[in-house]
Amino acid sequence: MLRIDAMRAIYPQLERCVVVTIMGATAAELQSVGHRPNFFYLQHAMGLASSLGLGIALARPELKVVVFDGDGSILMNLGGLTTLARYRPTNLVHVVFDNESLLSVGGFPTATATGSDIAAMAAAAGVPRTATVRDLAAFVAAFEAALGAEQLTTLVAKVEAIGPKAFVTDLPLLENRFQFARYLKSL
């Protein structure tokens, strides 16, 4: 499964969510599918997308928050899983695209390439709903179930280590920040 295909498949559902995405390939691919003012591309903060998403979910419990993370990113901040589990926001869906590599910074293998299991780590940390999917149909079904579950979910999507030609977004970082803040204030 390609990460961009997974994002395209659920893109219509993201219109009604607050979306935080980690840097690099994930951010660039989501923007290439189509930018929306409810999307925040967290650049230069590897490992912190789940933390930012948690803060938004706790501050705005009436909003559905989706975090797009990567295996390299979440492995840099495993404490983020325990913090998610501690607070258990019912409005947060944490999607981890696991390509078993640090694709955006050179393609070096991550620990998941040798057997580490992010969904099992999330479950052991106390995240109430976890799943690992390996194909597009299973991803879409699991994502839809997570959106409707009203329970903190970490969904690990195993994807190919293929990304865009460039790992940057066209939207200036400050403009994204201000646009996203205006969006949240308007709700």
What are these regions (language model features)?
Residues 23-26, 99-101, 158-163:
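Glycine-rich beta-alpha junction loops
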Residues 1-46:
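Active-site diphosphate/adenylate-binding microenvironment
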Residues 78-87, 93, 104-121:
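Active-site-proximal loop->helix
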Residues 109-144:
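Conserved thiamine diphosphate
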Residues 30-33, 105-109, 166-170:
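Short acidic, glycine/serine/threonine-rich loops at helix termini
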Residues 18-23, 41-42, 67, 131-133, ...:
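General beta-strand structural signal in soluble alpha/beta enzymes
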Residues 29-98:
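Thiamine diphosphate
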Residues 3-4, 36, 149-187:
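Glycine/aspartate-rich loop-and-adjacent alpha/beta segment that forms the canonical ThDP
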